[in-house]
Amino acid sequence: MNDVAELKEFAVTHARAQNIAGYRDVLARVDNDEDGAEGSWAIEWTRAGAALEERGKHLEAAQCYNMGRFPFVDGPARSDALRRCVAAFDRWRGPGIERIAVDGGQVRGWAAGLSAAKPRPLLLITGGIVSIKEQWAPILSAVTRLGMAGVVTEMPGVGENSLPYTPDSWRMLSTVLDAVAGRADVSRTYALALSFSGHLAMRCALDDPRIRAVVTAGAPVRGFFTDRAWLRTVPRLTMDTLAHLTRTGRDDVAGQLDKWALTDEQLRALEIPVYYMKSARDEIIPPAEAELVRSRVREAHLLEHDDTHGSPGHITETRLWSVWAVLHARRALPAQRLALGAALRLLRARPPRR
């Protein structure tokens, strides 16, 4: 059972990222996190999703169901919310988005723009430890407009991914590339990997030259995994989620994380550009992680927001910067890059949303 106040605090970033209308009304109705109870987190969000689904608003329903299973499935109510989320997204998606299954179905994803006749460069999209593929898959139509194929998948243990999260989980990304190699030009893969999946993408790029760039936001690098004093300040929800994903006891997870840390040698060995968005007041990721990237990675591009984890007050700016970063790494669509750069400068001149 999660702390309701902490759930509500974390929910704001994800609700804003999905443009969920009326999310504050749903949060106001939540007063507990007991599985299946009236007024509980999963029940209230599932009820909101069902009401939208009855009106034929399948994407909006999927977004509410996604919030209902947040941060991870820990009982029947959240399991039902996840099942409904995937089903609602499946009903919403058009013919241009297809379902994929990898590694015997242990890894699942949504894809667009795959073609054996005309394989395109691939944008591989992954969320962090609490965000599922259905949260990010709606952007696939925009990916194809950039002249790329896109695959959205999940970190191990997240959503429908049944793998455990281990120090070797980066290999999963290579497995996904292998699975679509016949229908995408995976030799030109660009990873848009948020938060903890950014760490996976950087580690994978050391061994898999098909990854040509990593665009990330608030990714752990070393300090998060090794600094016990910092870990004691990390929100309980984050540590509980990591314990769930790693299949480790809550009291033992901190002692296991040092195996994930990237060394100076590994960071210096990265021969690809890394685009890293830092939140200056991040309550999860230590501030020194961005400095490690800047000082060790050969080609590092940093963007900093005066904000908390995920920069909920800078969502539009982060989205534009992420698209710009992918195009910059590809050296593609120069006119669009210039337009994005101009839009970013205008946004950065405005006060942040609080």
Across the structure, where does each feature detected by a protein language model lie?
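N-terminal cap/lid segment of alpha/beta-hydrolase-fold proteins
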Residues: W45, F72-A116
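Catalytic histidine-centered segment of alpha/beta-hydrolase-like enzymes
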Residues: F72, D307-R319, R337-G341
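Alpha/beta-hydrolase active-site loop
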Residues: Q135, L163-A184, Y190, R203
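Conserved alpha/beta-hydrolase
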Residues: V143-E160
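Hydrolase active-site cap/lid region
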Residues: R203-G255, I272
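Short alpha-helix in the alpha/beta-hydrolase fold that links the catalytic acid
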Residues: I272, P286-S295, D306
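Catalytic histidine neighborhood in serine/cysteine hydrolases
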Residues: S295-P312
